[in-house]
Amino acid sequence: MAQLEGAGVLRNALLSALNVAAGTSGEPTAVGKQEVRRILVVELWNIGDVVLLLPFLTQLRKSFPRASVTLLARPHARVLLEGTGLVDEFLDDAAPAENWLSLNPLLGGWRDLWRLRRQLRSRHFDLAFQCRLHVREHVILAMSGARRRIGYAFGEGDRMLTDALEVGDPHRHKVDDWLRLLSVVDATPDDVFTKLAVSPDESAAAAEVLRLRGVSDGDVVIGIHPGASLPEKRWPTERFAEVAAELASRPGVQVVAFADPAGIGAELHDVPGVIGLSTSLRELMALIERCTLLICNDSGPMHIAGGLGVQTVAVFGSGVARWFAPLGDRHELVSAGSAQLAGGIDRVTTESVLQAVDRSLAITAARGK
């Protein structure tokens, strides 16, 4: 118990020291809409998390059309958001999360922290936003020196914000978490968002890749991506193969199986009638855009499809669909019940996924697309 209390004291002392070093005040500063010239947004997580930023970034553009928006994120954000016009400047951050989690100075990473502080301070931000319940992001907002630093209340890190919103509804979708932050600056969000952008050249290259592999105009193109960031989010690859084999046997259907950078999904390339592809992130986006439907796990590709307006059949395991469902309403989310039960994703059957595919295709046919 004494050790735990000591760790808590050290953590609080470090947070206090960081806040003092940041030179920030916890009091909100009045910033009129017309005064806002530079905005910082922090999202240091995965591909899907960046895609779920689209509605927030869209509303930020509408509310502050003359402001420059800087996104502090991992390098994939720059690739994903290329061509959307939603971000004026990308700052890449690759600081190890473990160092930030512990706030232990013996683990290193402090030189990177101060380098980042200099980068952010030099931009003189008026507003800064983040919506993680994570001390790392609170520290970054404090280090930015932004006049208004907006996020959610989270333990001792609250002192680093000028506007700390109560978390409130625990069932809220991640998109709504972001949009709710705009209430602090009197912005009223709507349901319209800018989609991910694929250039004409990228689209033409994707079409040619498919044409060379026998895909014709009028074919129903079904993509399958069996990868995911965590093992507990991955439906067994052999069941994806069963789905692929069934769909590939149907007249007028072309199945395209994508392998992820780690090679997950490469086994599907051996399924008779399946087109197997390994791609870059931008190539994957262009190919998904040409699909009628993407079958996948709760993963980055699922969110990419949602960000492109492509319907999905997504298998959920440890993730919670009501928090992390893809953008849009053209999706079938398949799970075996409680995400808390061990082996939940393994209980999802091949038949249930095929039924979801048939429902999605029926809706597409009824809509004429």
Question: Where in this protein do the model-derived segments appear?
Answer:
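Catalytic machinery of carbohydrate-active enzymes
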Residues: 1-369
